[in-house]
Amino acid sequence: MLSAIYTVLAGLLFLPLLVNLCCPYFFQDIGYFLKVAAVGRRVRSYGKRRPARTILRAFLEKARQTPHKPFLLFRDETLTYAQVDRRSNQVARALHDHLGLRQGDCVALLMGNEPAYVWLWLGLVKLGCAMACLNYNIRAKSLLHCFQCCGAKVLLVSPELQAAVEEILPSLKKDDVSIYYVSRTSNTDGIDSFLDKVDEVSTEPIPESWRSEVTFSTPALYIYTSGTTGLPKAAMITHQRIWYGTGLTFVSGLKADDVIYITLPFYHSAALLIGIHGCIVAGATLALRTKFSASQFWDDCRKYNVTVIQYIGELLRYLCNSPQKPNDRDHKVRLALGNGLRGDVWRQFVKRFGDICIYEFYAATEGNIGFMNYARKVGAVGRVNYLQKKIITYDLIKYDVEKDEPVRDENGYCVRVPKGEVGLLVCKITQLTPFNGYAGAKAQTEKKKLRDVFKKGDLYFNSGDLLMVDHENFIYFHDRVGDTFRWKGENVATTEVADTVGLVDFVQEVNVYGVHVPDHEGRIGMASIKMKENHEFDGKKLFQHIADYLPSYARPRFLRIQDTIEITGTFKHRKMTLVEEGFNPAVIKDALYFLDDTAKMYVPMTEDIYNAISAKTLKL
């Protein structure tokens, strides 16, 4: 009897070791699932409360519990939770009393990273209004479109972006839009100032009755994403979605004594949903910078005692490419949250800057599925978690890149790919994993839905991303499909770029696509152009045109002049061969041009330019 007991005890003692040998990620998988399940239970309980518990409630609790704790660090300025609370009260009152806004209205914000962005957003939440986060890089037609599709009544804009707003001012005034500079004065006719009105009103708390109609399904934010066709689309972010966005910071172990350094633009979901809102939930501190600077990055980390950083893959590559310094490891950063990090850059970053815990993740602003590399497998974006997959239904399906559509079998259903093969990520649309769609774009919302995927009547979200699951169940990002590519951390819609280039008088037809550049994340823009008869290419005119209408990351850096632009059997532009051929003048016999920022024109692409790009002596 005693020997049997000893045998059982020995078995229990060695069980964890045996499990670890047979299933090395078992305990990590279980731990991750339990954390994610806890987030889900918590969010669902928040939604059942009346009124629903939004992210604002978490902020108000932190402001009451730790009023004097630093919330925002910017340059040499420190704002506490209480100060931001009072300032956002003034914002809500000014919007209510002077601008006549009420819950359910939408306000568009066009400004860079600064403390005002945060307390303007909190003021809008206190009033029950939604905020549209406009990309300050876009101009003219795209900017006007982004404003109009969200149904905003008011535009709040930074004075530094005066030229951008004045360009569309007549159209805004025609639509009876109220425009205000986030300043105390205005020198533009038709644009008023806002901060002087904020200064005049009380800092007293805002009555809950001002936001009494807000529920979990109420739109809180509109964040813009370039999709597979056309102009940017406004992804609708509900108050429920904001809570799920903070899940990453909970799973990664963000703490109240952390200082989070954000250089990513606030109009991105990463900085807003994960950075700002994650900080609020943890009761931590945010250190802000208007724009990323590789030379100042670690100095800022030391200045603000930063412990957590946010990144996109490009950002960490810039840091690795910066000149080495003796104090590269002299910092307190323990955690890095982000996506798009290549395996080689990951290794180089950790080797140079220390054993920083990197939490790579995969997600899309409007998507209903996300992954997290909680096992810290270099190069992966996540793992197939068996328990999670029992709750959330997703798959990788075969995709015909040439036809730009999923492959279907003889019965008309999609085909799952085996491990080791690349497939299109799709996730079933359910109450637990909803797809809220795009504001003012029903057709584009429908295009992101896949019907009759595995059986008649089922409905899935089409991520537009190609991923691969290896034989250890790790998930790897492969590429985007269709007419979108990613460069400098931004999605670029090829049709929007093509429409812009096509407005130039000597251009007959345009085919825009992204090409790979060695040692760079994403793909850089390239355009194949067919000239109009009896017209000559003008590199200076084309440069000026795209500089006026496209942000820098969307401008085609390479041009290829072709006599004929090939199309598919469904009359779509053929891109695969062009993508594979890239921009090497030794391979391509067509006329090639390179966008020269210094000369402010497109110049002939030479071997010297190509070699300089390959050697990374010419920055793109």
Swiss-Prot record:
Using the record's annotations, give every residue carrying the modification N6-acetyllysine.
Answer: K291
Ranges in the Lumenal compartment?
1-4, 128-261
Cytoplasmic side stretches: 28-106, 283-620
**SUPFAM superfamilies tied to this protein:** Acetyl-CoA synthetase-like
Question: Chief subcellular site?
Answer: endoplasmic reticulum
Example GO molecular function term?
Answer: very long-chain fatty acid-CoA ligase activity
Keywords of this entry: Acetylation, ATP-binding, Cell membrane, Endoplasmic reticulum, Fatty acid metabolism, Ligase, Lipid metabolism, Lipid transport, Membrane, Microsome, Nucleotide-binding, Peroxisome, Phosphoprotein, Transmembrane, Transmembrane helix, Transport
Q: What biological-process GO terms show up in the record?
A: bile acid biosynthetic process; bile acid metabolic process; fatty acid alpha-oxidation; fatty acid beta-oxidation; fatty acid beta-oxidation using acyl-CoA oxidase; fatty-acyl-CoA biosynthetic process; long-chain fatty acid import into cell; long-chain fatty acid metabolic process
Where's it found, cell-wise? Endoplasmic reticulum membrane; Peroxisome membrane; Cell membrane; Microsome
Modification type Phosphothreonine: residues = T577
The residues that cross the membrane are: 5-27, 107-127, 262-282
Recorded topology in the membrane: Multi-pass membrane protein; Peripheral membrane protein
**Known EC number(s)?**
6.2.1.15, 6.2.1.3, 6.2.1.24, 6.2.1.7
One GO cellular component this record assigns the protein to is: peroxisomal membrane
EC class of the enzyme, as a word:
ligase
**Catalysed reactions, semicolon-separated:** (E)-hexadec-2-enoate + ATP + CoA = (2E)-hexadecenoyl-CoA + AMP + diphosphate
- Positions binding AMP in this chain are Y222, I223, Y224, T225, S226, G227, T228, T229, G230, L231, P232, K233
Family per record: Belongs to the ATP-dependent AMP-binding enzyme family.
Function statement: Mediates the import of long-chain fatty acids (LCFA) into the cell by facilitating their transport across cell membranes, playing an important role in hepatic fatty acid uptake. Also functions as an acyl-CoA ligase catalyzing the ATP-dependent formation of fatty acyl-CoA using LCFA and very-long-chain fatty acids (VLCFA) as substrates, which prevents fatty acid efflux from cells and might drive more fatty acid uptake. Plays a pivotal role in regulating available LCFA substrates from exogenous sources in tissues undergoing high levels of beta-oxidation or triglyceride synthesis.
Please give the name of this protein: Long-chain fatty acid transport protein 2
